[in-house]
Every structure is written in structure tokens, then in C-alpha cells.
């Protein structure tokens, strides 16, 4: 039982006053794919808060996780009046906080954001009503008058623009408005985030990947068009993430014009500012992918993880909207994973001895999902994968699943990723690294989680390409389909980048896939696709993406199966999926233990 009117002193990352009922969980939550931007309902079916409405409540979670688009969802909620009244975290949180900062800087809307000590946060979880004033959070018992406490926070955050940060002449010019109103607003937002991160200076960035081009609702469009109309122009090479629709085919697909036109307007606002219409969630497959050590600013959770982990480039997990701010100025906070010493692992996950012949490609997303859940905000190093010789596509699948569950922006795999030639390289000088020995049987829990559909349900749709398929994956898909016949009641769809589609078309793969019955979609990705692209009659979806198997039930209202690419093709031909676990899991489970 909490003492009556307990007071907790924390750090106010965004100042303000609020009071209301507390909705709380000790599990991180991704707002994109986890919260409906129109209603505020938690739609992540795997989360303890599933079904709750955040409107007019105080939300307490340790941090966000998963998608960089959480800032966009929160902006939608705040501008429509359906958002929470305050956010309380147990550690610094960038994505959701940035959504509040943008709402305040651009639209004059705001809510308090407070970070409490872990012990105080955990105690607060038992409260029913709370009040926030600056950095102070007070519990309010049922029947008491709702009030805001006096702000006696002992740790005020200095967000005075530029005063605590070393600025160059160029930075001052942006801040003074010498380069226009859009760049000025962008620099203000960058400096506020830099202060929150404890950065002492800004650095030049060689390229930006923008995730804010994802249409989350009217607010995302209003934000982009405002910057464009204020004269915004990117000053560094900038690519665009997947958008809400296949820009060249959405009308033929029957997408309602209210959504299709809004998505096109949003994409156009960014291309008007000079961004390239790459429209892919896998920018690491583009020729412009950064090299090891390159300082970049990428958004899109799977892309961030891949850039840091597999390419060895340096980027923070940038929230939507901060990405375009950096593109308009070419400057980013020098903090987080931009700094070499912050890239070392604090968690070691050791695998048992496995052989490549023992596994299939479902192993990597299952493992990534599990490691991400264990790691949380910690950077992990995985030992024992090198003998399996994972491909770049295997690492893509691992990273996307990892990024779904973790808030950490990178991982290491000893003998595989560039900064982990040895375990010592990955750990560096860090002390007190926790070591966990993983049992492959632990993956059975992940398998059951991702296979949320009932056993032996008919499969209606095979969903592939989350993240976007590579040319190698399209080639393998064509090989698996060759000489076989698709079930006439199963649709098969795969998403990829325009550039990848062009290469596949030249190689004759698109025609071959079409003959089997595969529809290849560009520009968009599965986390944005809804009806009627997903047929209204499709009730059960199968995918080889752990990311989509996690988010899909909440985003689509459908049941999901997860399995390897080969088993997806089998289901496309048979019309059903046998949910029997892969041999690399089932062979390790003691007889009589029961296997689904």
C-alpha cells in the first residue's frame, strides 16, 4: 500500500502540470504498432496494457521500444486531444519525448515528461491517481482532490537552447534564422534533444534516412508541410523510408482516396524538401549505404540496428521528425552511439553449439526476438552464431526482430559483426557484463507467441518483405515456387524497394513470381498495409517476419502464423500451415514435454 500523497522527485524533460488516473506497466511499449493513433487504445496484443485507452490518463512505462514512429503516433494523439496527460519513465526516453517536443515547438501543445529513479518508478506502479508538476510526481488517493504538487524537483533539466552546448558559427546561423524558419525550428528541436541527451556539441552528418514520411494521420502531414512551406531544404543526402501506399498503384489496389492522397501529399512534402524517393525500410540495401565508422542519422528501427550492428556506421535511434530536422541542418547531437565508447556490450548471450545443417532461416528472427526481449535497453553481444555463417539477410531478419523487442539500437555477434572480431572487442573496457547461457528450447516460447492463430486454421495470405526483401530473397522465393502450384484461395504478397524491383525485373524474377501468383508491391511495407490490399476475406496471415508477426495482430485484427520462407511457400501451396516447431527447437525438448 502506498502512503497517502507520496511525493517522488525526478527530472522534468518537458515541464508542465497534469493530474489524472495512472495507467502503468513495467514493460516498455512501442507506440507505433502498439497504440492506435486515432483512438489512443493500446493495440499491442502481447502487452499487459492491451485494450487500455491512454486518453486523459497519466502513462507510466519504463521507456518506449521498437519503432521510431512512436513520436508520430504521440503527435497525432496530442494534436487531436486524445493523448495522455503526462508521461512518466524510469530512464531517458527519446522517441516519445521528441513527439512532445515537436508538439510544443511547432504547434504549441505539450504535456509533462518526467523521468523517475527506478525504485521510485517501481513503487509508483501501485498508484491509481497521480499528479505531476515539473519534476515532481505525487500519488493522489481516490476521493482526494486532484491537484498538482509544488515542483521541488532536485534535478531540473537545463534545456536552455545552446547555453550548455558548444555551438559552431553554422549552428548559431541556423538558430538565428539566417537559413530560414524551417532550419531555425529544426535547430531548436535538435538542441533541446541534445540537452536531454547530455551532448556537449553537435557533429556533421553524412546522410539521413527519414522515417517520418510514414503517414500516421493529419498531424504527420501538417508537420512536414509546415517545414516545407517555411522553406525547408535538406543539406545532406537524404533517403525516404517506406510510405503508406504503393505510390504508383494505390488507386488500382482500391485504397481509399482519403488515405492514398494524404500519403502522397506527405511523400511529396519530403521530396519537395530534397529527399530522394527511395521509399524503403531497408536503406542498407541501397548503393548509398554508409561505410564503417560513418556518422549518419537514420530513423526506422530495423535500419538503425542494421546500420550500427552490421555496417558499423554510427547513428542513434532517431525518432521520426528529428530525422528531417537533422537533414535540414546537417547537424546532430554528439552522443549515444556516435561515441565509440558507448557502443560496447553490457550483456553477453552465449548459444549452445549448433551446426548450420541444424537450422532454417526462421532461427534468426526467433533468436533476435528473444535476445531483444532479454536485452531491453542493453547492447548485447551474442556468442556462438559465427559457426552458422549467417548471411546479410539472416542478420536483417535477426535485427528487425531484435529492434521490435529492444530499445537498444545495436547488437554484436562475435566473429560476424564488424566491431566484434572477438568477445573482448565487443565488451571493450566495460566491467560487470552480465552473461546468459541461452538454451535453444527457450525459443519455443517465442514460436508460440508469434504463432497466434489456432492450429490448422486455413491460411489466407502469405505476407513477405518486412523488412523489404533483397534481390537474393526474391531469387530464393522464385526458386522455392518454381514448378509448384499456388492454392487458389491463398494470396501471396511481397514488398520490396523500387530499386530492388527493377533489378528483379531485369533478371526475369518478377515475371516468374507473377506466374506463380505472387503480387510484388513497392514503396510501402507491411506495418502500413491494411484493407483492401489485405483482402477483407483474409482472416489468417502467415509471414516469415517476427516483426510483423508481433505487430500484425494489433495492426490488422488478423490471426498470424510465423515460419521459415520455405514453410511459407508450402502453406501457399497447401492452403494451411502445420504449426509443428522447427527441428532445431523440438529436437532439444525432452520427450514427453509436449510440443506445439
Swiss-Prot record:
It catalyses: cis-3-hydroxy-L-proline = 1-pyrroline-2-carboxylate + H2O. Its EC number is 4.2.1.171. This is Cis-3-hydroxy-L-proline dehydratase. Keywords: Iron, Lyase. Catalyzes the dehydration of cis-3-hydroxy-L-proline (c3LHyp) to Delta(1)-pyrroline-2-carboxylate (Pyr2C). No activity with L-proline, trans-4-hydroxy-L-proline (t4LHyp), cis-4-hydroxy-L-proline (c4LHyp), trans-3-hydroxy-L-proline (t3LHyp), D-proline, cis-4-hydroxy-D-proline (c4DHyp), trans-4-hydroxy-D-proline (t4DHyp) or L-serine as substrates. Because of the low catalytic efficiency, C3LHyp is likely not a main physiological substrate of this enzyme in H.jecorina. Inhibited by Zn(2+). Not inhibited by pyrrole-2-carboxylate nor its derivative 2-thiophenecarboxylate. The active site is at 67 (proton acceptor). It holds the Pfam family AcnX_swivel_put. It comes from the Eukaryota. SUPFAM superfamilies: LeuD/IlvD-like. The keyword Transmembrane does not apply. Gene3D superfamilies: Phosphohistidine domain (3.50.30.10).
